[in-house]
Amino acid sequence: MSSNIAVVGDRDTVTGFRLGGVREGYVVETPDEAEETIRNLIRDGFSIIIVTEKIGDELREFIEETTSSSALPMIIEIPDKTGPSERETDPLRDLIKRVIGVEMVK
């Protein structure tokens, strides 16, 4: 493995990150395909996995189970080309609070 960062998402998101220098990018079409890809990345030792918010919403329970017991891997959710989704909570804010134990922004 040449990188500790991978991106999982739609073709446009993955292409954008590859152009930005992220070597490991995986285009997925279904939630099952996304979950299998993320499981493989975790098994391969990736410490940061970037996914689109759509994937995050579809795999919420799996992501929370995966990230609740340790700081790594970090699964970071980003908007796709359609823009940010409306949410009551911010997964990135929750991750920061869990990792450092303090809420940074109120």
UniProtKB/Swiss-Prot annotation:
InterPro entries: ATPase_V1-cplx_f_g_su, ATPase_V1-cplx_fsu_bac/arc, ATPase_V1_fsu_sf
A single GO cellular-component term on record: plasma membrane
Location in or out of the cell: Cell membrane
One annotated GO biological process: proton motive force-driven plasma membrane ATP synthesis
Main subcellular location of this protein, as a coarse class: membrane
Keywords: ATP synthesis, Cell membrane, Hydrogen ion transport, Ion transport, Membrane, Transport
One Pfam family cited in the UniProt record for this chain: ATP-synt_F
GO molecular function term, any single one: proton-transporting ATP synthase activity, rotational mechanism
Topology class, membrane: Peripheral membrane protein
Family (UniProt): Belongs to the V-ATPase F subunit family.
Subunit organization: Has multiple subunits with at least A(3), B(3), C, D, E, F, H, I and proteolipid K(x).
Job description of the protein: Component of the A-type ATP synthase that produces ATP from ADP in the presence of a proton gradient across the membrane.
Name of this protein: A-type ATP synthase subunit F
Organism of this sequence: Methanothermobacter thermautotrophicus (strain ATCC 29096 / DSM 1053 / JCM 10044 / NBRC 100330 / Delta H) (Methanobacterium thermoautotrophicum)
